[in-house]
Amino acid sequence: MYSDFLFNINQIIEENGLDETSNILSRFAGNRPFFALDSGITCNDIWERSKKILQCIEAIEDEDKQRILKSAIHFSAGIMPDYDSVENRFSLVENLENTIKDFKNSNDPFASRLIAIGPCGVDHDWESVEYEGRIHDYFDTQTIREEKDLFALQLTLGKKLDIPCIIHSRRGFSETADVLKAVKWNKGVVHGFAYSQSELEFFLNLGWYISFCGTVTYSGKKNFQDMIDAVNYVPKDRIIIETDSPYYAPIPLKCVRNEPLYVNYIYEYIASKRGVPKHKLSETVDKNIQKLFGLE
């Protein structure tokens, strides 16, 4: 009933182990979700993710929960920006294209469930941390241009393959907008939306769906009111909800590891802000996901 548009199974397993991840998925199955998407961060991690998530599901004793999860689980494949991916962007996106084609034509039980490219985009947060002795001053216009290139290459691949894309944008709206204007592929979701209403209007005018995660519940954030304004402004037919777990657990669980089950808190919070029943918001989100990805 309460779908989670995006979580990160490899990171959940890394933090919890396989056995506990099975328990996490079992708890999530109690939501009876229509949809759940596991996102990738490298060009060819889809094979490992598919294998691990199936292993975790089949370790659940309750066969009904297994059935629910096997029906709900979908995947994206994409390349998040970091030093190596930005530097090797051309070969990695070529690898990504081959991986998508090979996976979709394989005998993997989830072969038909790879439905999006991403998350991909512009993230200036990763530039501000020290990496191999290099700090923020290392970054210059060339680095930013190359990061935009990586994003543009993946959007172009989405356009070529007619696959929706999932945008990841952190403190990089202007660069994100530049790429979208240049590539002109506007089919997909802006995930973990963290901007204000003016930026929201830009994405909506291009046709993007907007997904919110637990950060909308963080009342201590400087841009909190901007986020609430955005939550209320998004049209009914464009709103989507995610956990982005294991990150960004919603209030009142901010200090614990996030998991897909906690999407319930985000539905409840956003429903209260929009003045609609929680179950009605869930139905709306499922319809939006179904329409965007052409799901039965």
Feature-to-residue mapping (PLM):
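Mid-domain alpha/beta scaffold segments of enzyme catalytic cores
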Residues: M1-E296
